[in-house]
Amino acid sequence: MLADIIRAIILGVVEGVTEFLPVSSTGHLLLAERFFNLGEGPFWKSFAVLIQLGAILAILALYFSKLWNIARGMFSDPAAQRFVIGVLVAFLPAAVIGAASGGLIKEYLFNPWVVCFTLILGGGILLWVDQLELKPVHHEATEFPLPMYLIIGFAQCIAMFPGVSRSGATIVGAMLLGADRRAAAEFSFFLAIPTMLGAFVYDLYKSRADMTMDHGLIVAVGFAVSFITAIIVVKTFLTYVTRHGFALFAWWRVIVGTLGLIALALGR
């Protein structure tokens, strides 16, 4: 039991740290499973899905005031209505494409080789975008034009490939369309709520047979660690990227991907 709790803590930290950073939480969890045997077996695969709820609730807690004001204004405030429609429009491509091809992607592409290559490629793209002399024209995530929300939604679909990073794809898409770093990151967080919640419910339903009440304590520990870690990371991340950009995360991706390829080539 103690070993399982320690494993739950480690995976909770990995989820909480990487879910909202542009480094790919799925990619890191797959590599942790491959090289450190941290996620093997049906239960631990289901566990990785369950602790995503902790990260989702972290965003709800951090942005509760803003989200509550939007919810209250849904039937009377045109700006709130427009933002809700924008989030739904951005969510739609992932919902449709994910339902149609998610199973095939998981079957054929969820392997360490793909993760390592996409980590490196995504790191290179993130470095390139970060060094562009972009002139942001959108400074509030709640005020993007509707077509911009849709394009960001299609950018999110690229992250169905493991190692790409959902937050990385949406942040890059938003910045190329004129958002500043903070607004791009914040919209990525808002879009994560329906996207991750939908994936959570779908995967939870599919893996329901692997969960029992005996796992309650382990799941609770991982959930709590994921929640607390995500809150700390999101608050720190926004301050950091506003001042320094994304180069640190880009180089992290390149280093992890390269080390992973070396380990795989050596038969590890």
UniProtKB/Swiss-Prot annotation:
Q: Which Pfam families match?
A: BacA
> Which InterPro entries did the record assign?
UppP (IPR003824)
Taking the first listed entry, what is the main subcellular location of this protein, grouped into a coarse class? Answer: membrane
Domain of life (superkingdom): Bacteria
Keyword annotations for this protein, in alphabetical order, are:
Antibiotic resistance, Cell inner membrane, Cell membrane, Cell shape, Cell wall biogenesis/degradation, Hydrolase, Membrane, Peptidoglycan synthesis, Transmembrane, Transmembrane helix
State the annotated membrane topology for this chain: Multi-pass membrane protein
Recorded E.C. number(s)?
Answer: 3.6.1.27
Among the entry's GO cellular component annotations, what is one? plasma membrane
Single GO MF annotation: undecaprenyl-diphosphatase activity
**UniProt catalytic activity:** di-trans,octa-cis-undecaprenyl diphosphate + H2O = di-trans,octa-cis-undecaprenyl phosphate + phosphate + H(+)
**What biological-process terms (Gene Ontology) are attached?**
cell wall organization; peptidoglycan biosynthetic process; regulation of cell shape; response to antibiotic
Its subcellular locations are: Cell inner membrane
Give the transmembrane ranges: 47-67, 85-105, 109-129, 144-164, 184-204, 217-237, 246-266
Keyword Ribosomal protein carried by entry: no
Q: What class of enzyme is it?
A: hydrolase
Described function:
Catalyzes the dephosphorylation of undecaprenyl diphosphate (UPP). Confers resistance to bacitracin.
Other known facts:
Bacitracin is thought to be involved in the inhibition of peptidoglycan synthesis by sequestering undecaprenyl diphosphate, thereby reducing the pool of lipid carrier available.
User: Sorted alphabetically, which NCBIfam families does this protein's record hold?
Assistant: PRK00281.1-2 (NF001389), PRK00281.1-4 (NF001390), undec_PP_bacA (TIGR00753)
Q: Which family does the similarity line name?
A: Belongs to the UppP family.
Q: What is this protein called?
A: Undecaprenyl-diphosphatase
Specify the species: Rhodopseudomonas palustris (strain BisA53)
